[in-house]
Amino acid sequence: MSQDSKPTKSAAGAIAEPSNFLRQIIDHDLASGAFAQRTNLAGEAIPSIITRFPPEPNGYLHIGHAKSICLNFGLAADYNNQSGGARCNMRLDDTNPVKEDVEYADSILDAVKWLGFDWGTHLYHASDYFDRLYEFAEILIQNSKAYVDSQSADDIHTNRGNFGQVGKNSPYRERTPDENLQLFREMRDGKFKDGEHVLRLKIDMAHPNIVMRDPVVYRIRHTDHHRTGSKWCIYPLYDFTHCISDALENVSHSICTLEFENNRPLYDWIVNSLKELGVFKDPVPHQYEFARLNLTYTITSKRKLLQLVEEQHVEGWDDPRMPTIVGIRRRGYTPESIRLFCERIGVSKADSWIDMSTLDQALRDDLEARAPRATAVLKPLKLVVENFDAAHSEACSAPRHPHHPEWGNREFNFTKELWIEADDFMQEPVKGFFRLYPPIGDQPGSRVRLRHGFVVECTDFETDAKGNITQVNVNYFPDSKSGTPGSNNYKVKGNIHWISAAEAIPAEVRLYDHLFTDPHPDSGDKNFLDTINPHSKETIKAYLEPCMKDVKPEDRFQFERHGYFVADQNDSAPGKPVFNRTVGLKDSWK
C-alpha cells in the first residue's frame, strides 16, 4: 500500500482481497512435499506447517504485535484442515534476565488469548532450552565454530569494522577448542565478572554482512532469571536462541519483520552448522520477513512507549491512547475488529503507512451489527417543554438495535424537563442548520422532532449573567408522538436526541483523540514528544438514558449520533458508569 493508504474497494464496493506472499510460499512448500510426513526428534508425527509467535517479555504487546499474532495463528488455522495439518506455537523469548518480568509475560499471554487465539499445549519458553542451548554451544566450540573472546565490549565493536571497512580478527580467535571449552565452562560456573568474556561464532570477520562478523552468542550476566533463578550466570543472545528454538520446536516457517532480514544468513548458518554436526535433520526451519505495521499517529517503539509511561505523558500502559493491546482494549476496540483490520491490510515485503481510519472502520464494521443502541447527552443543555404538565410523563420506547427486533426495546419517559445537546441549539442559526433556534423577527422558532418522542417548536431561551445559554424553551404538539398516526402530519428536517432530566443517569465520559498531532510522529529527525497532542483527552460530565444505570465494565454501545463507546474496564461500575469513546460514527481524523 502507498503512504497513509487504505484498503482498496472493487467496483461493487467490496474491500479487495489483501495480498499475502507467505501463503504462496506455504502453498509451494505443501505442493512440493517439503514438510510432508514430518516427525520430531522423538519420532512422533507432527504437522506439516508450524508457525510461532515468540515475543520477548520485556514490555506490553502493541498493535504491531497484533499483526504478527493474527498472521502466525491465522496461517496455522487456515492450513490446519489441509493435508498434514498446521499449528502455531506460543513462545516467550525470555533469555535476557535484565529486562524481562513475569508481569510482561502474563500480559502477553492474556493479549493473545483476548485476540481469540489458542496455543493449546504448545506454550514454550526459550529458557526451557537453556540446557540444550549450552550443549549446542559446546558442540560448536568442539568443532572450531565458536570461541571465547576476552576483548572488551568496546574493542569488539571497534574491530567489527563497518560497511566500508572489513573487521579485524580478535587476538583470541585462534584459541584451541580445549582452551575455549575450559573458559566457557568457567564462564558457566561463575568464575568471571560480567563482560569479562563472551562466546562468539567463528564465521568471517571480512563478511560484507556485519551481522556475520563473528557475532556474540553468549555473555556473562550475574542476574537471577524470573524462571530459572540463579542457575545460570551466562545467557544466550537472541540470534542464537531464536533459530535453535525454532528447530527444537520443528517450526517450518519462521516469520518475522523486515528488520531481521540481515539476520537471516546468521539464522541459516547456525541451523545448518548444527545440522551438519548431526544435531538437526532436514527439513530445518527457514526465516521469512514481512513489513512491520506502520500506523499513522502512532509509535510502536518499546523504548519510546516506556518513555511516555515513565514521564507520565500517559496514564500507564493501558491508557486508551496507547497503541498497546491493553490500551486499545480499554479504548474499546474488539478482538474481532483487530483481526478484521489485520486481514484487510494484508502482508507484504514493502514498508508503507496504514491510515488510522482503516483500524477505526474495522471497528465500526464489527460493532454496527451487534452493538446495542443507547442515548447519551454529552454536553447537556436544559430543554423545558412549557405546555407539558410537570406532574405528567409520557412513556416512550426505542429499539435496542434497529436490525434486531428480537432484542426488544428501551423504555423511557418524556417529561417537562429534558436534556439535549448544547450543539442542537443556535441563537443565530447559520445556513443549513435545521435543529433548534428561537423566533427571528416575524418568523416562529424552528421545529424539530425529539427522537422517539414528540415534535417541538422553540419559543425562546434563557441566559446567565455572562450571556451563556442555560435553557431552551419549547412547546410540544401532543398529536405528533412517534409511532402514532398523527406523527405523519408533521414534516420537520431536524431530529435530535434527548433524555428526561428526571431519569437521566450521570456519567463520566472520556473523549479521546490522537495522542500525536503528526501522522508520522516517529519519522525523520523530529522529537516525537514535540508532537504530543495536548487535547488528546477530554473528560466531561454527561447524561445517559435510564437503561444504562447498571452497565458492566467493557459493555459496548453505539451512542446514537455520537459513536461507539465502552464502559471503562477499570473505572466503570454499576450505578457509576464511566465511558470511553472508541471511535465516532464517521471518520473525522484529519
From Swiss-Prot:
Organism equals Polynucleobacter asymbioticus (strain DSM 18221 / CIP 109841 / QLW-P1DMWA-1) (Polynucleobacter necessarius subsp. asymbioticus)
Q: Where in the cell is it found?
A: Cytoplasm
> In its UniProt entry, what is this protein called?
Glutamine--tRNA ligase
Signal peptide segment: none
Its GO CC terms are: cytosol
Q: What is the lineage of its organism?
A: Bacteria, Pseudomonadati, Pseudomonadota, Betaproteobacteria, Burkholderiales
Q: Which residues bind ATP?
A: 56-58, 62-68, 257, 292-293
Which is an annotated GO molecular function term of this record?
A: ATP binding
Q: Which top EC class applies here? A: ligase
Tell me which UniProt keywords the record has, alphabetically. Aminoacyl-tRNA synthetase, ATP-binding, Cytoplasm, Ligase, Nucleotide-binding, Protein biosynthesis
Residue span of motif 'KMSKS' region? 299-303
